[in-house]
Each structure stands twice: as C-alpha cells, then as structure tokens.
C-alpha cells in the first residue's frame, strides 16, 4: 500500500501542478529517474465508434478497440494494471505513488525493443525476445494492453519489460482474445521492419515455431483476424502510408506462415 507521507507521494504532489504534459520523465533529488502520468483530457468517443465500425465489418474481434475513458479513469486503470501485473511476476514499472490526478512509477530502461529491432544486427533474436516475453505474460495468466514494440523495454539486465497500461482489454473481451490481441499488436508493429531488412522469411520460420507453443484457439484467432487483410499484402509503394504498410507486412507474414506450413 502506498502511504500518503512517503517521499514519492510528496514528490508526486509537487510535480503534478507544474507538469504541462500528460506523461513526463523526472529526476528526483535522490538522482532516481521516474515517470509521472498526469490525468489528461478524455479521448473523443467518435474515435472508438469509427474504429469499432471497421473492426466490426471486417470481423476483427481481436483488434476491436478497448474503451479508454480518459482523465482519472485512465490513471486508476494504469495503477491497477501495474500492481496486478507486478504481483503476477510480469516485469512492469513499479508504482511509487498515486493520487486521483496522477501516478509516479519507476523507469525500466532507455531502449525499446522497437529500437533494438530497427538498429541492431541480430534483429531476429530481439524479435524472438518479444515473442517469448509476451508468451511468458500469458503463462502467468495475464495479458497486456498495447504491446507494440515501442511499449516493450529491453532492460539493462537483459530482461524484457512492458509499459503503457492505460487500457484494460480484459474488461471487454475474453482472455483468449486478449492473448491474440497482444500478439497482433506486436506483429503489426514489427513485421514491416523485418521485411524492410530482408528478414521476413526468417521471421516466418520463427513465428511458425512459436505458434507450436500456443493454444490452437489463439493461433486460429490471429489467423482469423488477419484474413480480411490478406489482400493488402500486395501493397508495397510508400504512397500507401505507414499504417497500411504495417498491416500489409503483417498480412504477408501470416499468409506466408500459413501457406508454408499448412
């Protein structure tokens, strides 16, 4: 339990009134690096209505949006998710202080898995690291929120950490759907990088080996979610923009795996 008189709580109370952005990094008087997430504006409901419409017409159940009510509800959700995940052995930031208007938590590391996959020579090893870390979370009976590679930290001690828990998918979908959603977030954010680096075929082999360790239901849900997007795998020109090309690379990865090993 976080006590009101602990030094982190005092620091949070001092920081919140002067922090201009929703999320910011701070160095405390002790030299410790922390992050503060401040309550911000609610996200317009039309975003969820629009995204939900596309998810519905394509039957993308595992990709359907999770309501984010913004403001204090986000703070409460994030604090709760951090505590639950940490209690189940998932490497997430430790909650140091909380109030209705914000939370303070620890800094896991400087480099995201996205940066590592983009710039390191052994990008496939890093990619596999993300797959294994997501599976470990599920083996603990837990799920993540949006495990895009930018939200996965390559920690200095060699472990893998997760950040960004402002949504709780488990309130709106089954555990199996949460598992599928976690993988889809990760694959969608990384397949295009591996394709650009000429490593998509190798990634297909790794992904197939990984699917052999997963529940058949999860694998089926992932394939079903991507099936309506398979036509996009022929999109290559930059004029399509980053988001469509990410989906195109995801579709190509899943298609190649299914075609090669079905």
Task: Show the residue positions of the predicted features.
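Conserved structural core of kinase catalytic domains
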Residues: 47, 55-59, 68-86, 90-128
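Conserved protein-kinase catalytic-loop segment immediately C-terminal to the catalytic Asp
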Residues: 148-155, 161
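ATP-binding glycine-rich loop module of kinase domains
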Residues: 22-73
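Catalytic-loop of the protein kinase fold
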Residues: 139-149
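Juxta-kinase regulatory segment immediately upstream of eukaryotic protein kinase catalytic domains
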Residues: 1-25, 229, 236-239, 243
């Amino acid at each position: 339990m976080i006590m009101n008189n602990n030094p982190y709580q005092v620091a949070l109370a001092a920081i919140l009134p002067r922090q201009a952005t929703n999320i910011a990094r701070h160095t405390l008087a002790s030299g410790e690096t922390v992050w503060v997430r401040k309550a911000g504006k609610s996200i317009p409901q039309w975003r969820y209505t629009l995204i939900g419409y596309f998810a519905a017409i394509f039957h993308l159940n595992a990709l359907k949006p999770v309501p984010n009510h913004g403001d204090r509800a986000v703070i409460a959700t994030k604090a709760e998710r951090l505590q639950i995940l940490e209690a189940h052995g998932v490497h997430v930031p430790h909650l140091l202080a909380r109030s209705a208007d914000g939370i303070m938590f620890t800094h896991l590391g400087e480099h995201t898995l996205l940066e590592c996959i983009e710039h390191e020579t052994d990008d496939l090893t890093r990619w596999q690291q993300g797959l294994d870390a997501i599976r470990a979370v599920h083996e603990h009976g837990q799920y993540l929120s949006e495990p895009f590679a930018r939200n996965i930290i390559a920690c200095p001690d060699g472990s893998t950490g997760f950040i960004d828990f402002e949504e709780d998918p488990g309130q709106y979908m089954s555990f199996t759907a949460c598992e599928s959603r976690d993988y889809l977030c990760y694959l969608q954010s990384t397949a295009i990088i591996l394709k650009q680096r000429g490593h998509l075929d190798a990634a297909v082999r790794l992904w197939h080996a990984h699917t052999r360790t997963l529940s058949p239901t999860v694998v089926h849900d992932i394939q079903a979610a991507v099936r309506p997007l398979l036509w996009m795998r022929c999109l290559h020109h930059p004029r399509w923009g980053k988001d469509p090309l990410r989906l195109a690379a995801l579709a190509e990865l899943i298609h190649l795996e299914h075609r090669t090993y079905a």
